[in-house]
Amino acid sequence: VARRGARKQTPAPSRLILDSGAVIALARGDQRARGFIERAIETGCEVLVPSVAVAETVRGRGPRDAPVNRILAAIDSVLVADEAAARTAGDLLGATGTDETIDALVVAGAILAGGGRILTSDPANIKKLARATPEITVHRV
């Protein structure tokens, strides 16, 4: 029985956050990565890429980067690494004793977006950084 005046809780939208390894896997036609994207589309899941993953994967706009640029053009949004993300990443690095700044910025972006699933080719580092954040799950591409 709902209390009178109580606001109905709505779940946070589902998010799929792609790190650079996931973007590269998609650009190469990796079937496992495509499966994650297909399920995201089927379920209305928002697909995001941190700006640091864009920097890691793009080397120009020429033919060599065409597959990566096609993937990035289809993404719902880019998670910008602003001061809040940088500070959150710094907190994660301090709490875990790691020095994987790019991975920390990926996790920080996911935290600030409200959680979600991170698709990565390097789950060990991402899991370590996200271990205290239950609203984030990590999946290997």
Residue ranges, per PLM feature:
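Alpha-helix capping/helix-boundary segments
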Residues: 22-23, 53, 85, 105-106, ...
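Acidic, metal-associated active-site segment
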Residues: 57, 100-117, 125
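Short, polar loop motifs at secondary-structure junctions
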Residues: 62-63, 121-125
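Short loop/helix-cap segments at secondary-structure boundaries that form the rim of catalytic
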Residues: 126-133
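Short, well-structured N-terminal submotif of metal-dependent ribonuclease cores
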Residues: 1-49, 58-76
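Short hydrophobic/aromatic-enriched beta-strand-loop microsegments
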Residues: 135-141
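Short beta-strand scaffold positions
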Residues: 49, 80, 101, 120-121
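Acidic catalytic patch
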Residues: 75-96
